Amino acid sequence: MSDNKAIQTLQNTKEFNEVIKVKGSLIIFDCFSTWCGPCKVIDPQILKLSQAYSDTYFYKLNVDEVPDVAQKLDIRFVPTFLLFKDGEKVAEVVGAKPKALEDAIRANLGCGATHSSN
């Protein structure tokens, strides 16, 4: 996993499988589609969350471009946010709900979480 804190878009199953194996970090998958209005609306808030919670890693997953991963994750609605830690899903937020996503992030971060209030 790179140290670049930009939100990266996963291009294929191999990339997903590599990211999911990372231990010790909270990983958030933003499962979206380009035709999804709520996905576009929440994007700026997701960027803010990725910057506010510096010890998390955010990845975008276009369900139309990587359908096998979307099916494996049982994505039925976009946007869906999946939170993984040590290879296990620890939370799921369905819909464009930034407050619920932030609550899930906070609940799953250990001590030493870095957060800057807005």
From Swiss-Prot:
Involved pathway(s): Mycotoxin biosynthesis
Taxonomic superkingdom: Eukaryota
Ranges of residues in domain Thioredoxin: 1-110
InterPro entries, per database record: Thioredoxin-like_sf, Thioredoxin_domain
Pfam family, one: Thioredoxin
Alphabetical UniProt keywords: Disulfide bond, Redox-active center, Virulence
Disulfide bond residue pairs: C36-C39
SUPFAM superfamilies per UniProt: Thioredoxin-like
Induction notes from the record: Expression is up-regulated more than 10 fold in toxin producing cultures.
PROSITE patterns: THIOREDOXIN_2
Gene3D superfamilies (alphabetical): Glutaredoxin
Note: Gene clusters encoding host-selective toxins (HSTs) are localized on conditionally dispensable chromosomes (CDCs), also called supernumerary chromosomes, where they are present in multiple copies. The CDCs are not essential for saprophytic growth but controls host-selective pathogenicity.
Similarity comment: Belongs to the thioredoxin family.
Biological role stated in the UniProt entry: Thioredoxin; part of the gene clusters that mediate the biosynthesis of AM-toxins, host-selective toxins (HSTs) causing Alternaria blotch on apple, a worldwide distributed disease. AM-toxins are cyclic depsipeptides containing the 3 residues 2-hydroxy-isovaleric acid (2-HIV), dehydroalanine, L-alanine which are common for all 3 AM-toxins I to III. The fourth precursor is L-alpha-amino-methoxyphenyl-valeric acid (L-Amv) for AM-toxin I, L-alpha-amino-phenyl-valeric acid (L-Apv) for AM-toxin II, and L-alpha-amino-hydroxyphenyl-valeric acid (L-Ahv) for AM-toxin III.
Protein name as it appears in the record: Thioredoxin AMT13
The species this protein was found in: Alternaria alternata
Taxonomic lineage from the root: Eukaryota, Fungi, Dikarya, Ascomycota, Pezizomycotina
This protein's encoding gene: AMT13
